């Protein structure tokens, strides 16, 4: 069996060095003094740690205790536009009550007229998965982390809250070597910038997501979490993913059929447990109580974990600017557990979808991909409509492939754009765009100024936007190192 296994890298660089910098090194004294502000007369807010679509993350300290915290700031207007303010308040109310040693603590929630402030535990140890990026863990170490993961997930499930985005970026390790699950109650911000200044999308890759979630049908979030725990356990023991393929459609098919192989070093007991975790039918998937009864899980398990539940206090602050004179009014919200739609789904509904960029690596540079929740037929209609609006000649070469031709000759002849639609699952389509003829600079101008803006209505998430890596806009002009006439 071992010779048949194709081993793909566990994580790319952007996954290992997670952009949500709650657990990165604390800023130096000089850096803090340069950017220090005071938030609500309670927290010193230092340098910017991360930046995303919905807001920013800052390093901070509580003034009275000196405790390090991470301060996540979200734009309230974006929440209101989705009509989900009350929904996220209820979910936060639940998570504010949670105190579990294996969950990153949401310490406090405050709000002004325009912003929501989440005061989070600052975890120093780093990502669990950075420990295994060069190889698998020993079985006893993997078991310890899996036990702590299941304990955290079970605790929140018992309170009606599912994570729905369990993945390597959300598994941290504190200075004592214990697991901390982040973003329970707050879904990870979909796009954040690392310290290298590059944008890295961090929404859940399909490699960790349950089949029923990918199909976008009604699903039980708790059962989806169990599937993700199975993927995580496999990776802890193997050092690589069970479902991975250079071809996106093949990977989807593997997930939908749960087609994978076990490395030869997996013990019979671990294989037995994983086979029950990675079951396609969620109704036949093993439950958490059953997981906890398995011999493999129970080996070397510690005493039951003690935890506490605190009273909720959410502050609504009327001042728009954090200062030392901010006035606070405290209100108490009764925790309610939404049955079908909670904060994770809420954030996901506003997020940019799955980050599939690592799956689309290609030598053909001028190509882009995006996922869409529109049907393939609707997408084709939209593409043809865009071509006509841009006064281009439209030619459908296949049922789900279309070419758009410029009507005038450019510097290197007539420009042509090819678009092809792949329906990988019900309500999930992948669209590939590329330059098939013409000048590179003219194509990039057409793409950036006309094609991409016109597509935003149907785009769930952009992926593998590789043409931007080779083209820079300077003084209003596009400059490229590309000389080829065709890239698809």
From Swiss-Prot:
Pfam families: NAF, Pkinase. Its EC number is 2.7.11.1. The activation loop within the kinase domain is the target of phosphorylation/activation by upstream protein kinases. The PPI motif mediates the interaction with the ABI (abscisic acid-insensitive) phosphatases. It catalyses: L-seryl-[protein] + ATP = O-phospho-L-seryl-[protein] + ADP + H(+); L-threonyl-[protein] + ATP = O-phospho-L-threonyl-[protein] + ADP + H(+). One of its GO terms (molecular function) is ATP binding. GO terms for biological process: defense response to fungus; intracellular potassium ion homeostasis; response to hypoxia; signal transduction. Residues 43-297 form the Protein kinase domain. Residues 183-212 are annotated as: Activation loop. The modification Phosphothreonine is found at residue 201. It comes from Arabidopsis thaliana (Mouse-ear cress). The gene is CIPK25. This is CBL-interacting serine/threonine-protein kinase 25. ATP binds at residues 49-57, 72. Keywords: ATP-binding, Kinase, Manganese, Nucleotide-binding, Phosphoprotein, Serine/threonine-protein kinase, Transferase. It is an enzyme of class 2 (transferase). Residues 336-361 form the NAF domain. It comes from the Eukaryota. CIPK serine-threonine protein kinases interact with CBL proteins. Binding of a CBL protein to the regulatory NAF domain of CIPK protein lead to the activation of the kinase in a calcium-dependent manner. The keyword Membrane does not apply.
């Amino acid at each position: 069996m071992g010779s048949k296994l194709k081993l793909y890298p566990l994580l790319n660089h952007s996954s290992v060095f997670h952009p949500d910098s709650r657990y990165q090194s604390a800023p130096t004294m000089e850096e803090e003094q340069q950017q220090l502000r005071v938030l609500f007369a309670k927290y010193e807010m230092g340098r910017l740690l991360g930046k995303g679509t919905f807001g920013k993350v800052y390093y901070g300290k509580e003034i009275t205790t000196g405790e390090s915290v991470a301060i996540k700031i979200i734009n309230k207007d974006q929440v209101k536009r989705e009509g989900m303010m009350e929904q996220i308040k209820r979910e936060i109310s639940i998570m504010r009550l949670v105190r579990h040693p294996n969950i990153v603590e949401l310490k406090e929630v405050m709000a002004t007229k325009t912003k929501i402030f989440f005061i989070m535990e600052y975890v120093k140890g780093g990502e669990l998965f950075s420990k295994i990026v060069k190889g698998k863990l020993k079985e006893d170490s993997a078991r310890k982390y899996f036990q702590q993961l299941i304990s955290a997930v079970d605790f929140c499930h018992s309170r009606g809250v599912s994570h729905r985005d369990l993945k390597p970026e959300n598994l941290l390790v504190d200075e004592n070597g214990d697991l901390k699950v982040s973003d329970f109650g707050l879904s990870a911000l979909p796009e954040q910038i690392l310290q290298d200044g590059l944008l890295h999308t961090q929404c859940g890759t399909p490699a960790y997501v349950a089949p029923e979630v990918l199909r976008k049908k009604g699903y039980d979030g708790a059962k989806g979490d169990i599937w993700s725990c199975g993927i995580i356990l496999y990776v802890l023991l193997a050092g690589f993913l069970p479902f991975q393929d250079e071809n996106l459609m093949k990977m989807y098919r593997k997930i939908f059929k749960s087609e994978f192989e076990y490395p030869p070093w997996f013990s019979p007991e671990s294989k037995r447990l994983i086979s029950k975790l990675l079951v396609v039918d969620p109704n036949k998937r093993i439950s958490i109580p059953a997981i906890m009864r398995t011999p493999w899980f129970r080996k070397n398990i510690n005493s039951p974990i003690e935890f506490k539940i605190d009273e909720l206090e959410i502050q609504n602050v009327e001042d728009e600017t954090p200062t030392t004179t901010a006035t606070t009014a405290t209100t108490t919200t009764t925790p309610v557990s939404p049955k079908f739609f909670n904060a994770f789904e809420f954030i996901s509904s506003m997020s940019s979808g799955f980050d599939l960029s690592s799956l689309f690596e290609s030598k053909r540079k001028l190509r882009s991909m995006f996922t869409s929740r529109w049907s393939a037929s609707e997408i084709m209609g939209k593409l043809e409509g865009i071509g006509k609006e841009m006064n281009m000649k439209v030619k459908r070469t296949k049922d789900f492939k279309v070419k758009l031709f410029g009507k005038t000759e450019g510097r290197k002849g007539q420009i042509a754009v090819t678009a092809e639609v792949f329906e990988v699952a019900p309500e999930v389509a992948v669209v590939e765009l590329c330059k098939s003829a013409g000048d590179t600079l003219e194509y990039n101008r057409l793409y950036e100024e006309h094609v991409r803006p016109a597509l935003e209505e149907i785009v769930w998430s952009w992926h593998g936007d590789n043409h931007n890596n080779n083209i820079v806009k300077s003084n209003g002009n596009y400059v490229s190192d590309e000389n080829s006439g065709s890239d698809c």
